[in-house]
């Protein structure tokens, strides 16, 4: 059987063309009985030839046919040969199919009823009714052998395992609209998809997707169900008289594929089925080959089904109900064994029980498939709704963030407003410009200011939370009590008194400072000398220089008091120079001040006023500029630690801060510039006397507009470094020796210098 099957006659190359010849011969020259066989053969061949287009499917078909033919009983050998030849030798299929028409009388397995058992099995997956016809034959024809009834169950099982590949192959080939047997996917699309037996194919079960059609053990089960006595129409796979779309294995999905009626009705419907079989997808083709193999060799259905399931597992993995199909296949393999062992008479009785089992299995699997798919659909719908809700929430959050922090465009305005609040707005009367840092740094660091502002707000929130903290441990309560009872005594630097509570001293000092500033303003209005601040200045400086009180002063509001002292008097005159110098020094020594403190105290405006005032001393202006730079850098997130910057960063910063000079425009009157390279290469000729733009006089060189920021490399590093090395290398001993030699040379007695009148031997 192997040799016959894998012989050159069965090659894929010649299988496609003879299909049409076989169809013609089967339709024209054969009797009705023969037409049934030839038609089934041709249908199988046609689908098989189409199936040969796909190598993988064809390979599977060959494997199944070979195994089936090998496993055929001696009586089935003839049937398997004819079937295999029909598949792979379509030209000879007509004669062989005729022999089949005659052969049924000879062998019980090849009986006319069962001739369709093999042929119809070929067409089972073509028409999806082969299993139906065989099963009904088992009921109607008691003389049917174990083969025919083996096929009933095995086809159900193999169709289960083979269904997954069908729908996948059917998608591409199911594009032929005119034929109702378009494909699994198209039949699923049709509203009438599973009009077959009421039991097997409930209308609500229309296959929703390829995976369903693959999973559907229903069609297979429907074969057995459709064989119920009330529906004897499905005697043979070819009996397509009845438009009842007998939803058999693959064609349970094809609405118009009527259940296979007996061979009598096949004559008219056979011709229709032939084109339909051509139109049927690679699924049906693969099914044809597999079903033929099933009819021939049912003993090895186990191996076939296991191999089929193994090969088709990759496809089943795509399907949700893969496991169900495999389980059912295993159960049905066991059933096939029992069927093979039983006699033909026993099989007639056992077929009914097997059918009932298959039906129950199919119903269970169908219900599982439907439940799984419904659950998946619900999940997908739920996920979609959740995603929409998540999007809405994200949009709401974004809008809230914009309300809280403002958009990016607003961040720049916020920084400008903050600078204006702290240092005041720049006026036209400015005489000097502040060049602390360049605009690029400010723009790059705008985002960090928002973070710092958020941190400040968080700190405020934390303070509020601390006030409202209800729960305190015993240890914390004890610490608070101890702190309140005994404040630390701090000794003043002048060695004087002890201060029991720093807050009282700081608050009293601030009150005195504010009073002195108010008195000076009143005295200035009265045209009297304002000396209150000067008299209080030493005490203020003494307390403000104490390291342990600086934080307390800042928290208590000393910045507003200093602002009052640095502000100009009502007559627009500046306070005393000594006051300005001392307070600016103290401000530099104070620790970092928060932006809120700078904003509310107004110290920034006072310092900026001094920085811009034309009569302010240069030293005070420098200190004021440093203060402004130091206070404003945190607003823009710039670091004030230049030591941490690399050389490249410093050079880049200097380059960016270079003042942009106005480019001199080369306009009329001046000689138009020429590209020297073009002049040298001859592309552009030099101007000659008489040419426009030629100047017959010497010209002053054009000033260079370039900014030289890259220092040229020093090419005499070794020479310049030697003196340093020598100086560093001189030790005390060397210095002493040199000094001693110099003294000795100077202390030596010099002889009388001989000189000549001509000037010879004179020391130069």
From Swiss-Prot:
It is found in: Nucleus. Phosphorylation increases its interaction with PSIP1. One of its GO terms (biological process) is regulation of mRNA export from nucleus. The keyword Secreted does not apply. Keywords: Acetylation, mRNA processing, mRNA splicing, mRNA transport, Nucleus, Phosphoprotein, Transcription, Transcription regulation, Transport. Residues 44-67, 85-102, 119-144, 176-197, 267-320, 370-381, 391-405, 645-656 have a biased composition (Basic and acidic residues). Residues 1-465, 642-676 are annotated as: Disordered. Residues 469-764 are annotated as: Interaction with SUPT6H and ALYREF. Residues 560-638 form the TFIIS N-terminal domain. The modification Phosphoserine is found at residues 27, 54, 69, 157, 170, 172, 183, 196, 198, 209, 211, 222, 224, 235, 237, 248, 250, 252, 261, 263, 277, 280, 295, 306-307, 309, 321, 342, 344, 360, 365, 367, 371, 383, 385, 407, 409, 411, 426, 457, 459. Pfam families: Med26 (PF08711). InterPro entries: RNAPII_TF_IWS1, TFIIS/LEDGF_dom_sf, TFIIS_N. Residues 426-446 have a biased composition (Acidic residues). One of its GO terms (cellular component) is nucleus. The keyword Zinc does not apply. The modification Phosphothreonine is found at residues 380, 435, 671. The modification N-acetylmethionine is found at residue 1. Interacts with SUPT6H; binds preferentially to the POLR2A-bound SUPT6H. Interacts with ALYREF/THOC4, SETD2 and PRMT5. Interacts with HDGFRP2. Interacts (via IBM motif) with PSIP1 (via IBD domain); phosphorylation increases its affinity for PSIP1. PANTHER family: PROTEIN IWS1 HOMOLOG (PTHR46010:SF1). Belongs to the IWS1 family. Transcription factor which plays a key role in defining the composition of the RNA polymerase II (RNAPII) elongation complex and in modulating the production of mature mRNA transcripts. Acts as an assembly factor to recruit various factors to the RNAPII elongation complex and is recruited to the complex via binding to the transcription elongation factor SUPT6H bound to the C-terminal domain (CTD) of the RNAPII subunit RPB1 (POLR2A). This is Protein IWS1 homolog. The gene is Iws1.
